[in-house]
Curated annotation (Swiss-Prot):
Belongs to the antenna complex beta subunit family. Antenna complexes are light-harvesting systems, which transfer the excitation energy to the reaction centers. GO terms for cellular component: plasma membrane; plasma membrane light-harvesting complex. Residues 1-21 are cytoplasmic. The keyword Transmembrane helix applies. Its main location: membrane. The core complex is formed by different alpha and beta chains, binding bacteriochlorophyll molecules, and arranged most probably in tetrameric structures disposed around the reaction center. The non-pigmented gamma chains may constitute additional components. The keyword Transferase does not apply. GO terms for biological process: photosynthesis, light reaction. It holds the Pfam family LHC. Gene3D superfamilies: 1.20.5.250. This is Light-harvesting polypeptide B-800/860 beta chain. Keywords: Antenna complex, Bacteriochlorophyll, Cell inner membrane, Cell membrane, Chlorophyll, Chromophore, Light-harvesting polypeptide, Magnesium, Membrane, Metal-binding, Transmembrane, Transmembrane helix.
């Protein structure tokens, strides 16, 4: 067993940190796209205060 590898992934600390940056950046892109999508939907069909989705 390699002492530099971290259980349970088998990645080194440096590899894990690199992977974490990719995952974090991917999440940021996902959230950004979701925010833009929500703004566009709200602009087309406002919700709340008597909107179509509120009884």
């Amino acid at each position: 067993a390699d002492a530099n590898k971290v259980w349970p992934t088998g990645l080194t600390v440096a590899e894990a940190e690199e992977l974490h940056t990719y995952v974090t950046n991917g999440f940021r892109v996902f959230v950004g796209i979701a925010v833009v999508a929500h703004v566009l939907v709200f602009a087309a069909h406002p919700w709340g205060r008597g909107g179509a989705l509120v009884a």
